[in-house]
Amino acid sequence: LCPQSKPMGGFARTSPSYETPYKADDAMGKNGWGEGYTFPCLFRNGDKGWILISETGVDSKYCGSRLLGHENGLYTIGFPQEGEMNGNGTTAPGLALPGETPWRTVTLGETLAPIVETTVSFDVVKPLYEASGKYEYGRGSWSWIIGMDGSTKYEEQLRYIDFSAAMGYQSVLVDALWDTQIGYDKVEKLAKYGAEKGVGLYLWYNSNGYWNDAPQSPRGIMDNAIARRKEMKWMQSIGIRGIKVDFFGGDKQVTMQ
């Protein structure tokens, strides 16, 4: 189980950020750090097997939820905390009738195989739109996990493109600060170099509007429709494979919107 953290804490007030440590083999009847647990939640039913409880199909018509623990092994659905999104937005969703909630799924398995292999989170959800092509993530490399912000440099990303190509990987994730430490012009060169080797690029973006203090850039783009469309057009023109958006402000409906 992954405890839900209190809002507006941690690095640059970015919590709850779904980065708290998992607690293995914890006792029933607890409530994490007092705020419940983040989905998905995995339970072991003695020697009988495993139970995975999760949520899927959350969109702008509702909010994301968490699992609240009570005494005697009772767990209930909980709405977002009031302080999320810097206090902006309501904790309860506004839902027009007729309406529907997101799916809450329960997956059972005598072993962990059905838990790992289940596709129920995709099976019950209808696509919101028809994709313009067949998209596959594949395998990739990522310099930040070792070198952090300082590794987002042109020469280092060239090295990671070469590494991905040598390993037969399909991509490289270029993380935070690429806009200032590499620059848009050189990102285009990286994308072209990667394409020649069969390696696509993912670019990192800060989700920030007003909901936390995380300074890493690019920021002020993904929360603005006009800026976002312009950026997407540029990425499409140079063959960027996808994006990683970081520092979401919480699970309120305003975030989903």
Describe the residue ranges of each PLM region.
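A broadly tuned preference for mixed-charge, low-complexity surface segments
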Residues: T20-F43, Y154-Y160, S164, G220, ...
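Aromatic- and carboxylate-enriched substrate-binding clefts and catalytic-loop regions
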Residues: A176-Q257
